[in-house]
Amino acid sequence: EIEENAELDLFESFNAHAGDERISAVVADMEAELGKGNKMAGILPRLAQYELTLLDWAEAHKGSRKYVVFANKCWPAFQTQFGFVPCYVNSRLTKIGIPVACEVDIYGAVSEYIGVCVSQKPVTLLDINNTVPADIYNDDIAGKFPYTHKDTFMGFHCGNTASCLVKEPQMKFQRIMKRNLEPDSEPNISRGTLEGDIVDGNITFFRFQSTADAQLKGYIAEGEVLPVATRSFGSIGIFAINEMGRFYRHVLVQKNYPHHGAVAFGHYGKALHSVMTYLGITDIGFNQPKGMLYPTENPFAD
């Protein structure tokens, strides 16, 4: 069941939580979670107010349903009106089994929820369309890991990944929004990201998606996060998936998938494939090994 509400409705509810007596307890919990990474303590009360807003909203609106996910708008008007970026709160709710997808990504939220059910662990939602700089690949990956440059990519989002999945998590600000919205001042309304390199280890990148004619499709690709520093910002990691370049071209791009992918931390391809099959999905893309051509792949290409 989907309930659609305006950002204005959320803003009204947020304002109604001003002065909520529970805010101090949530701030204390945030402080304990962040530890030495609590670099912008002044924004925590507003973030706590927003977290309570979402939790109360879920309880008040779930009706007979047992589980809830959110697909929320998070920019550009959000910062100027709410006074922060919501990434850290999104990460905290996802950590406790209430996925909050960025940028109103409904199928991203559904994908995250299924990932939680399959893995029984927190998941995340990342952009899948950023390359690894050549110098990082040449210096830290080539000859050390069994991947070509095209097998690797940067999985990135502003700061929405749970603290348990990030190395040395720190409360920071969204740099792009800072440049656009408050270029000449100290970070204020751009504060609220949870930043750090994502923990290395096995992962499964996947997504459930609908087509314009209401047909479900999906993709699954197992891989890993490499133990290589990203030298960047946000919740970010260097991912490696065998034959990623071909998979990106012939599945993600050719089949019009959005740039968000859900990430489960472990290899769960078998279970996710079964879930997709149970849901009647027949178009299930995966990273086909070298020599196993995609239907439109040129057999004469290098």
Identify the role of each PLM range.
Residues 1-129:
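Conserved, well-structured core segments that form the ligand-binding/active-site neighborhood
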Residues 5, 15, 38, 72, ...:
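Detector for Asparagine
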Residues 15-18, 85, 138-141, 276-278:
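Surface-exposed beta-strand edges and their flanking turn/coil or helix-capping segments
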Residues 69-76, 127-143, 291-297:
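A glycine-rich phosphate-binding loop feature that marks nucleotide/adenosyl-phosphate handling sites
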Residues 75-77, 161-163, 268-269:
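Short, glycine-/Ser/Thr-/acidic-enriched flexible segments
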Residues 174-302:
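Extended hydrophobic packing segments that form well-structured cores
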